[in-house]
Amino acid sequence: MPQKEKTLRMDTPPPDEILGRQNENLENEDDELGFKEMDGLREALANLRGLSEEEKGEKAMLRSRIQEQSQLICILKRRSDEALERCQILELLNSELEEKRMQEMEKMKVQNEQVQKLESRFMTLAANHELMIRFKDEHKSENIKLKEENEKLRQENNSLFSQALKDQENKVLQLTAHNKALVEELEVLKQRCAHEAGQARAREEELLALQNQQACEHAKETEQLRSQLQSIKQQHRQATEQMGKDQEANINMNQELQARLHTVMREKEELLQLSMERGKVLQNKQAEIRQLEEKLETAAMAKKHALERFEQEAVAVDSNLRVRELQRKVDGIQKAYDDLRLQSEAFKKHSLDLLSKERELNAKLRHLFP
């Protein structure tokens, strides 16, 4: 120390008071710079700790959004099950309508068979009536022939034989009486035939009326059955069309829901990926914070060593160089802190944009599937 003081006095001969004042000023400036560095680093650490708490809140919000999306997926599955139940009910109604149609066809077949039986009976009655008319005509023609023969025989008797004629007349009288009896019998037969013909005609008219009535009723029933069949066919066609439309709408809805679900799952994966990336970024930021703390400790140690060297060397020029070096280090630390703060603000803005997009997507899904 005495040799160094001697060399300083030989190079620059300032007094001892000036050196003491310079040393005090340098010490005060170093203390102020150290306090400023410590305050800036404390503020950076506080901001980073606050940022990590916000990230924890954002993760909780992401978990709630994922739960809401799972609830929406459950709602969509329940809607799909309800549409499937409606399709099964329509299929059951279609099968019941088909069974009713087959039953109506069987009834129509039975009624057609009854109509054919009635027609065959009517044809049989008509044939019997024609036979009775033919028998009546034949009996009438035979009676006319007998009268003609009787007249011829009477004339022959009158011309040829008187006794024999009397005998013949007696015979004729007998024959006439017999003929009269036959005529009376014929009249009785005619009356009976007429009565039977009237009964047959009345029966025929009754049968015709009954047949017409049955034909009208059958026509009405056929028309009713035809209209019912048309209505059943119309209902079946409408039910089939409605079922086709429902199936098509269900398929379109399922496709749209699958597309939306795929989009939601993709966005969910993207959000999970972003959350993982943000976790990695937080880990990196924490590592950077630890590095900054280490740098701060090294800077404090460097400052301490610089002060010790300054006290040991007590050279103004060398101390100014050390101060500049420390100032450069402080500027570098401040710049790194500013960069870190800008990155954290950008990351926070990006996270808020993603959350707003997720809220809009959830609002759209709630609007589409209330």
Swiss-Prot record:
<feature type="region of interest" description="Disordered">
    <location>
        <begin position="1"/>
        <end position="26"/>
    </location>
</feature>
<keyword id="KW-0175">Coiled coil</keyword>
<dbReference type="GO" id="GO:0005634">
    <property type="term" value="C:nucleus"/>
</dbReference>
<feature type="coiled-coil region">
    <location>
        <begin position="36"/>
        <end position="346"/>
    </location>
</feature>
<comment type="similarity">
    <text>Belongs to the CCDC89 family.</text>
</comment>
<dbReference type="GO" id="GO:0005737">
    <property type="term" value="C:cytoplasm"/>
</dbReference>
<keyword id="KW-0539">Nucleus</keyword>
<feature type="modified residue" description="Phosphothreonine">
    <location>
        <position position="12"/>
    </location>
</feature>
<keyword id="KW-0597">Phosphoprotein</keyword>
<comment type="subunit">
    <text>Interacts with HEY1.</text>
</comment>
<dbReference type="InterPro" id="IPR043450">
    <property type="entry name" value="CCDC89-like"/>
</dbReference>
<keyword id="KW-0963">Cytoplasm</keyword>
<protein>
    <recommendedName>
        <fullName>Coiled-coil domain-containing protein 89</fullName>
    </recommendedName>
</protein>
